[in-house]
């Protein structure tokens, strides 16, 4: 699993145009031939393009300067210089390109093969043969190539998932993601094992669901405590919230209320999303009793009890995920 980056700042530079050539035709039987300097090639452009198999911006590093190729100068015999190669920068779907200087949204790259030319390369200069006239038969000058441009941009990737697994640290979100998808999210028995969102694909027949394991939320996250609001904005992009509760803990109801309060504090729109509550760790002592209490306390809320260790309730949960997804 690559490191997840939700935003990165880079500078892109388009290529300079090649200079026009000053040249005169010199042949065995034509010692004083006319001007024949060719045009310079165009500089390469900078293009952002969506690639299907990318899911993060981790390929790019903050502060990187990425340059397209310069055009080549013109040559004699009216030969044009080669154009500089375009610089194509591949990004995942749902990447937004901003002007870093003023924050303007330049383009939103959503779908496979979407592309955006952020900077065009400089034009090549004209060779001296272009400047020959009836009164100026021997032009001893040519145009320089047009300079390329540079731009500092911010790339932002919005994590888009059908279902977001939301819970306090160590609630079992990563283990659940690993169980129901082919993801390999890190699992350990200490808080904040998941420090970046992980995505997994849940497949069933002809249906696919993208499941996101969001880093653990703690009290005050909506105000920047813990991993803060950095990933709450990604939760806002998911269609359905799956609140994962460690049902073996004595304070399971408090955990549930903390999650709701943080979602509500961040935005009412987020709080009002469709939800399913997952009571995890039913295999541990006292969990069954707590599970019954949770169902009574939540009333009409949809609650599914599971044990990842015993593979219990997993099929029912997957079924509920697909049922909820079809309501959109």
Curated annotation (Swiss-Prot):
SUPFAM superfamilies in UniProt: Obg GTP-binding protein N-terminal domain, P-loop containing nucleoside triphosphate hydrolases
Any one GO MF annotation of this record: GTPase activity
OBG-type G domain residues: 161-326
Necessary cofactors: Mg(2+)
Gene3D superfamilies: GTP1/OBG domain, P-loop containing nucleotide triphosphate hydrolases
Protein localization: Cytoplasm
Database matches in InterPro entries: G_OBG, GTP-bd, GTP-bd_Obg/CgtA, GTP1-OBG_CS, GTP1_OBG_dom, GTP1_OBG_dom_sf, OBG_GTPase, P-loop_NTPase
Keyword terms of this UniProt record: Cytoplasm, GTP-binding, Hydrolase, Magnesium, Metal-binding, Nucleotide-binding
Recorded GO CC terms: cytoplasm
UniProt main location, coarse: cytoplasm
HAMAP family: GTPase_Obg (MF_01454)
Subunit structure: Monomer.
UniProt protein name: GTPase Obg
Organism name: Borreliella burgdorferi (strain ATCC 35210 / DSM 4680 / CIP 102532 / B31)
């Amino acid at each position: 699993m690559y490191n997840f980056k939700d935003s990165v700042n880079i500078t892109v530079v388009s290529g300079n145009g090649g200079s026009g050539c000053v040249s005169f035709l010199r042949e065995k039987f034509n010692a004083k031939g006319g001007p024949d300097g060719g045009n310079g090639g165009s500089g390469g452009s900078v293009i952002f393009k969506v690639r299907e198999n990318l899911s993060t911006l981790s390929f790019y590093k903050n502060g990187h300067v990425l340059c397209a190729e310069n055009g080549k100068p013109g040559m004699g015999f009216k030969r044009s210089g080669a154009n500089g190669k375009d610089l194509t920068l591949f990004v995942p779907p749902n990447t937004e390109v901003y002007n870093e200087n003023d924050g303007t949204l330049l383009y939103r790259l959503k779908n496979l093969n979407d592309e955006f030319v952020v900077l065009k390369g400089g034009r090549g200069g004209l060779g001296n043969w272009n400047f020959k006239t009836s009164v100026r038969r021997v032009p001893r000058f040519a145009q320089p190539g047009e300079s390329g441009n540079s731009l500092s941009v911010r790339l932002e990737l919005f994590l888009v998932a059908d279902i977001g697994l939301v819970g306090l640290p160590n609630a079992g979100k990563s283990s659940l993601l690993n169980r129901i998808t082919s993801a390999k999210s890190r699992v350990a028995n200490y808080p904040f094992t998941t420090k970046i969102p992980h995505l997994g694909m849940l497949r069933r027949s002809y249906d696919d669901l993208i499941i996101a394991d969001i880093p653990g939320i703690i009290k005050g996250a909506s105000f920047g405590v813990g991993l803060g609001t950095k990933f709450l904005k990604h939760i806002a992009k998911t269609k359905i919230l799956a609140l994962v509760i460690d049902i073996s803990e004595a304070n399971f109801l408090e955990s549930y209320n903390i999650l709701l309060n943080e979602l509500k504090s961040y935005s009412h729109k987020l709080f009002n999303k469709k939800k399913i509550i997952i009571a995890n760790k039913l295999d541990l002592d006292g969990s069954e009793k707590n599970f019954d209490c949770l169902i009574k306390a939540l009333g009409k809320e949809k609650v599914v009890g599971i044990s990842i260790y015993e593979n219990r309730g997993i099929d029912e949960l997957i079924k509920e995920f697909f049922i909820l997804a079809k309501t959109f």
